Regions:
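Conserved helicase RecA-like core
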Residues: 2-366
Length: 366
C-alpha cells in the first residue's frame, strides 16, 4: 500500500518524500481514509508509529488556503508537545507548497506576540486549552471557522487535570466540526469519556511503545562537558552512555570528565581490540559510570541496564536518535534520554522529536 492508494494528494505525497517517508504505517493506512470521510475517530497506536501524520495529512487536505481564518484546532496537554506539533505541521505545509499559516498558542509565551501572529490569520492553531480560551475571550481568536478539532494525547486532555478546560473550548466550536483523537495509551476511562463527548469510532494498532523518558537541558555550548559532570552528581546514573558527534572529540571529552573525577571510559574508534574490550568490561562491571562513544564506534554494542543516554552532540537524524535511545529502557526497564542543547539547537531537537512523535520534557531543576 502507498499514500496514493489512500487518496493523499500528490503535493502532500511529495512533501512526505522529501522527509524520506514512502509508505504509510499501519495506523496511517487505517486512520487516513476514515478521517478523509469525515468520521469522528480515536486512533490508538504506539509511540513512533506516525500518528501525527495520520491526522496532519487529512488536516492539510481540508484546509482551504483562500479562507483567511482558523480552520483546524489542535489541542495538546503540554507546551512542549504543542510546539512539536506546530513545528512538523509548519514543515509539512511548506514542503507541500501550501500558503497557510500555523500558529502555536501556549501559556508562558508572550501573548502580545501571539496576538500579532493571529492577525496573519493562520489556518492551523496548535495550543493549550487555557491559552486558546484566553485569546478567544479577548476577542483575538475566532473559532467560528473551525472544521476540525484534534486532541493529541486525548487520554490526558480528557483526564481530570484538563477536562473542564477542554470542554470549555469544545463549547466555543461549531457543532458540525469533525473530531480526531490520538493517543499511544488510551485507557478505558478516556475512551468512555471520548465516546460520551464525540461518539468516535476506535481504530487501534497493537504494539510496544518506548518506555524511556526524553529530556532536554539547555546549556551554553562551552559548558556541555561540565553539565555532564553535574548530571553524574545529581542523577542516579549507574551506567550511562554519552554520545559525541561532529562538535566534540571523544578523547577530549574523556580527558575533561576524568579531570572532574568522573569514572569514564571511551570508545575512540581507532583503539586496539583489547583496549575496546577493556572499556566495555569496565562499564559492564560497574567500574566506570560513563561510556563515551561516537555513533560509529557504538555499532553492534550490547550493554545491559543502561539507565541514561546523554547526547553531548545532537543526533543528525531520527534514525540516529532512535539508535542511541534504544540503548536504554530495554526489556521494559526504566531509562531516560537527555539531550544537552544550547539555545540554537533547541529547534532542531524539537523537529526531531516531532518527527518521532515523542514528547520532550525539560529536565527538572535539582
Amino acid at each position: 500500500m502507498d499514500f496514493a492508494s489512500l487518496g493523499v494528494p500528490k503535493h502532500l505525497r511529495e512533501a512526505l518524500a522529501v522527509r524520506g517517508i514512502a509508505a504509510p504505517t499501519e495506523i496511517q493506512a487505517a486512520f487516513i481514509p476514515a478521517a478523509q470521510a469525515g468520521e469522528n475517530l480515536i486512533g490508538e497506536a504506539p509511540t513512533g508509529t506516525g500518528k501525527t501524520f495520520a491526522y496532519l495529512l487529512p488536516v492539510m487536505e481540508r484546509i482551504d488556503p483562500a479562507v483567511r481564518a482558523a480552520q483546524t484546532l489542535v489541542l495538546a496537554p503540554t507546551h512542549e508537545l504543542a510546539m512539536q506539533i506546530a513545528t512538523v505541521a509548519r514543515e509539512l505545509a511548506q514542503a507541500a507548497g501550501l500558503p497557510i499559516g500555523v500558529q502555536a498558542l501556549i501559556g508562558g509565551a508572550n501573548i502580545k506576540r501571539q496576538i500579532e501572529a493571529l492577525k496573519k490569520k493562520p489556518a492551523i492553531i496548535v495550543g493549550s486549552a487555557p491559552r486558546v480560551q484566553e485569546l478567544h475571550r479577548l476577542g483575538k481568536l475566532k473559532l467560528t471557522g473551525i472544521k476540525l478539532l484534534v486532541l493529541d494525547e486525548f487520554d490526558r486532555l480528557l483526564g481530570k487535570q484538563h477536562l473542564d478546560e477542554v470542554r470549555t473550548v469544545i463549547r466555543l466550536l461549531p457543532a458540525d466540526r469533525q473530531v480526531l483523537l490520538l493517543s499511544a495509551t488510551a485507557g478505558t476511562a478516556a475512551v468512555r469519556m471520548a465516546q460520551e463527548l464525540f461518539a468516535p469510532r476506535l481504530i487501534r494498532v497493537e504494539g510496544a511503545s518506548d518506555t524511556h523518558e526524553n529530556y532536554y537541558h539547555i546549556v551554553p555550548f562551552r559548558d556541555k562537558i561540565k553539565a555532564v559532570q553535574k548530571l553524574t552528581r545529581r542523577l542516579p546514573i549507574r551506567r550511562g552512555l554519552v554520545f559525541v558527534g561532529r562538535s566534540f572529540d571523544a578523547a577530549h571529552a574523556l580527558e575533561k570528565l576524568r579531570f572532574e573525577g568522573i569514572k569514564a571510559v571511551a570508545l575512540l574508534g581507532q583503539e586496539r581490540r583489547d583496549q575496546r574490550r577493556a572499556a566495555l568490561d569496565a562499564i559492564r562491571a560497574g567500574r566506570a559510570q560513563l561510556l563515551i562513544s561516537t555513533d560509529l564506534a557504538a555499532r553492534g554494542l550490547d550493554i545491559e541496564d543502561v539507565d541514561y543516554v546523554i547526547h553531548l552532540d545532537l543526533p543528525e537524524d531520527v534514525r540516529t536518535y532512535r539508535h542511541r535511545a534504544g540503548r536504554t529502557a530495554r526489556a521494559g526497564k526504566a531509562g531516560a534520554v537527555i539531550s544537552l542543547v544550547d539555545a540554537k539547537e533547541l529547534d532542531k531537537l524539537r523537529a526531531l522529536a516531532a518527527r518521532m512523535e515523542i514528547e520532550l520534557s525539560r529536565l527538572p531543576r535539582a
